[in-house]
C-alpha cells in the first residue's frame, strides 16, 4: 500500500521579528513550544523530522529585524532542509504583499 502524506501550509508574519522571534514563530506555528530549543539545530530538526508535506510562507521576510549574518544562516538552513526533504518542504520568502 502506498504511503499517504498530509499537507500543511504555515504562514508566519516576520515583520519586525528578531532572531528569537523567528524561532518562536516557527515553534508556535508547528506546535513545538514544549521541546523547541530556540536555535538553528532545533529549527532544522523541526522542519525535517516530519512525514507530511510542509509549505511555509514567511511574510515580510525582508522586514524581519535580522542582521545580515542571521538572515544568511536562516536562509542557508531553509535551503538545506528543503533539499533533504526532496520536495516535501517548501519555504517561500515573501517580501511584500500587494
Residue ranges and their predicted role:
Residues 1-98:
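Positively charged, polar, low-complexity stretches
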Amino acid at each position: 500500500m502506498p504511503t499517504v502524506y498530509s499537507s500543511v501550509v504555515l504562514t508566519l508574519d516576520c515583520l519586525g521579528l528578531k532572531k528569537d522571534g523567528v524561532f518562536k514563530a516557527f515553534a508556535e506555528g508547528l506546535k513545538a513550544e514544549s521541546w523547541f530549543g530556540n536555535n538553528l539545530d532545533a529549527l532544522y530538526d523541526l522542519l525535517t523530522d516530519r512525514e507530511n508535506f510542509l509549505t511555509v510562507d514567511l511574510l515580510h521576510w525582508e522586514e524581519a529585524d535580522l542582521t545580515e549574518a542571521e538572515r544568511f544562516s536562516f536562509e542557508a538552513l531553509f535551503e538545506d532542509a528543503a533539499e533533504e526533504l526532496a520536495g516535501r518542504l517548501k519555504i517561500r520568502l515573501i517580501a511584500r504583499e500587494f
